[in-house]
């Protein structure tokens, strides 16, 4: 996912790219928005820009190994957190967000990615 693939949000995309280019990236980012706003896509595009080996013109290249791994949601530095529902589990059995990642990746691939 590249910034160019996201419709609108030009000021925000430019701000995110400039912060990376200036070396001013905070230790954490929280992306939040209403359904249909493109929040997940924007967050993934930002991570891809951070990790890209060949950034150019305010966007990731989309072709280097890091870009390809992030586009497939398989990069080791990309961590997704999912809300969990503890109902249905045995008491004392911990529910972990990362248990849902294989299902999310399969659903993502099944629906053709972005």
Model-derived segments and spans:
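Clamp-loader machinery-focused feature within the broader ASCE/P-loop NTPase space
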Residues: 2-114
């Amino acid at each position: 996912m590249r910034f160019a693939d996201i419709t609108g949000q030009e000021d925000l995309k430019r701000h995110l790219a400039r912060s990376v280019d200036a070396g001013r990236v905070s230790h954490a980012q929280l992306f939040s928005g209403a359904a249909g706003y493109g929040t997940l896509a924007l967050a993934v595009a930002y991570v891809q820009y951070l990790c890209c080996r060949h950034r150019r013109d305010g966007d990731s290249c989309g072709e280097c190994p890091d870009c390809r791994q992030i586009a497939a949601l398989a990069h080791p530095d990309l961590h997704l957190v999912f809300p969990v529902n503890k109902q249905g589990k045995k008491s004392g059995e911990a529910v972990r967000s990362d248990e849902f990642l294989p299902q999310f990746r399969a659903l993502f691939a099944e629906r053709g990615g972005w």
